Regions:
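Beta-strand elements of repeat-based all-beta scaffolds
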Residues: 1-17, 21-38, 42-59, 63-80, ...
Length: 277
């Protein structure tokens, strides 16, 4: 059994494993994670500024990362263990418009008047453009490479209800989607013409998934709409719930069961594996 112990704030402070080892979490008074100590003795450490922004992180290998912020709490630089610094620049609306890595390579971002991403230019000069319809749905992304190359376009088609009905990739292959009157996905047809269909019960939950090769997955729910059984070509997986609505156990098609225990605040306190492992 693996047991989890929590502090007064509901945060995990110790995980105890069946072999007697443990992972220990330490927090600051405000609840921010201060350190983690793993079973092998290695640990991670975290530091924060007065506003709660992460300013320092030390990895299990002893590598140190430092983070700096502007007056609006936006991250403006990251220093890696080797001393290299990455920088971030923002526009007046708080959107990243330029990211520069420790080698000086820059990626630039442009936006539409509506705030959607319009263009990305990477350090090699490759540009990706994004187009949208009047509703703000992405309709096309176009990636340009070396001069003279054809742009690589991905096209998205939408219905009037706002559902994606087709995606056409740069090779011209199309994946299509259909929906029922309730807006639920009814079928997906991949580029090779293979169809996966979804079938719903009266309460709107998926009851069966049918694949092009004839295989099916059946799903059964209890009276309060919780999934309790999945039947597929491998067999039946059963899910038992406790009175509070938490998963109490999962039994796979081979009869192996994993059990879960929960605390009064809804936190998971233990996992019981088959054969006690």
């Amino acid at each position: 059994t693996t047991s989890v112990f929590y502090n007064e704030l509901g945060k995990a402070e110790r995980i105890c494993y069946p072999n007697g080892s443990s992972t220990v979490y330490e927090y600051e008074k405000g609840g921010r994670l201060k350190s983690v100590r793993y079973p092998d003795g290695a640990g991670e450490h975290y530091g924060y500024d007065a506003k709660g922004n992460l300013t320092e992180r030390t990895t299990t290998a002893g590598e140190n990362y430092r983070y700096n912020y502007d007056s609006l709490d936006r991250m403006i630089s990251v220093q890696n263990p080797a001393g290299g610094i990455s920088y971030f620049t923002y526009d007046a609306l708080g959107r990243v418009i330029k990211a520069e890595n420790e080698s000086g390579n820059q990626t630039c971002y442009e936006y539409t008047p509506n705030g959607n991403l319009a263009k990305v230019t990477d350090a090699m000069g490759n540009e990706t453009f994004y187009q949208y319809d009047a509703m703000g749905h992405l309709t096309q992304s176009s990636c340009t490479g070396a001069e003279g190359e054809e742009p690589q376009n991905t096209v998205y088609t939408w219905d009037k209800e706002g559902h994606v009905t087709a995606v056409t990739d740069p090779l011209g292959d199309v994946e299509c989607y259909t929906y029922d009157p309730a807006g639920r996905m009814k079928a997906k047809i991949d580029k090779d013409g293979y169809e996966t269909s979804f079938h719903y019960g009266k309460d709107g939950q998926v009851e069966e998934i049918r694949y092009a090769d004839g295989r099916t997955v059946s799903l059964t729910y209890n009276a309060i709409r919780q999934l309790e059984e999945v039947r597929d070509w491998l067999g039946t997986t059963k899910i038992a719930m406790d009175e509070a609505g938490h998963i109490a156990s999962v039994t796979d098609p081979y009869g192996k069961t994993v059990g879960y225990e929960w605390g009064s605040m809804g936190e998971r306190t233990a996992i019981c594996y088959p054969h006690g492992r």
